[in-house]
Amino acid sequence: DPSKKVERRVRFQATKYVILENELYYRTIDGILLRCLGDDEARSLMGEIHEGVCGAHQSAFKMKWMIRRNGYFWPTILEDCFKYFKGCQGCQKFGNIQRAPASAMNPIIKPWPFRGWAIDLIGQIYPPSSKGHKFILVATDYFTKWVEAIPLKKVTSANMIDFVKEHIIYRFGIPQTITTDQGTMFTSGEFEEFAIGMGIKVLNSSPYYAQANGQAEASNKGIIKLIKRKIEENPKRWHTLLNEALWSYRMACHGSTKVSPYQLVYGHDAVLPWEVKAGSRRLSFQDQLTSDGYA
């Protein structure tokens, strides 16, 4: 009640909140409204974001970014995210062990999306999947960090060509460059002829320093960690969860771009399970639109 004597600090904090349709919202410094969540909703949201169907087991800071990015708020977000992250058994079991001080990476940057891709092979994987897959072929776009990947039973030049055509060219256009290691499937005459015919320049990293293809190496680590966390109880079904792992990777905040690959590719945020469950301002607005409003 404004007529009552209230401490100045409380009055100031109250100006940051607004009630719309019986829902409490927090107004950011940019004027964006974030729906305020109670304790139960906050715990449920953290669980979905961290380890749900499209959760990528991200750090506390990235969890906070995802929560606010998707339109939610409560006063102790970061503190609660740290508690949840530190209590996650999957993160404790499969998280990185830092043996040396972290140093800044210098990623290759292309001036346009999908003009340069890094391709690498994960495997041989043990145990193989229940369908006999032993490898994962991974491609990462240098600009957006978008990742494409498929499981493979065997590695051939024909498989590489089909992958480039179906998962890169047919979806994103012909790239300028593809960076690979010195694997025979990439250096074969068949693959070289295909690349020349498409006008693609194939760059090979040194066999003595495969880490030169750093973008592919980084993507591989991320995909492997996601798969391990999702298939702990049944390792032989990893091929069925690869697309789920890719979804998690594409929706996660990337360290170098500070946004998700999905947002860079499509220009907006995807509607994810937690937003459907908790509800959001944008979904409410979309539900009220008529066919004329969409025009």
Walk through the language-model features, giving the residues of each.
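Active-site beta-loop-alpha junctions of metal-dependent nucleic acid enzymes
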Residues: A149-Y170
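Short, contiguous acidic/charged loop-to-helix segments that flank catalytic cores in large enzymes
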Residues: I125-P128, P151-T156, Q211, E233-R237
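Domain-scale segment recognizer with a strong primary affinity
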Residues: A56, C88, G116, W146, ...
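Well-ordered alpha-helical segments embedded in enzymatic catalytic cores
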Residues: L45-E48, L121, F135, N159-V164, ...
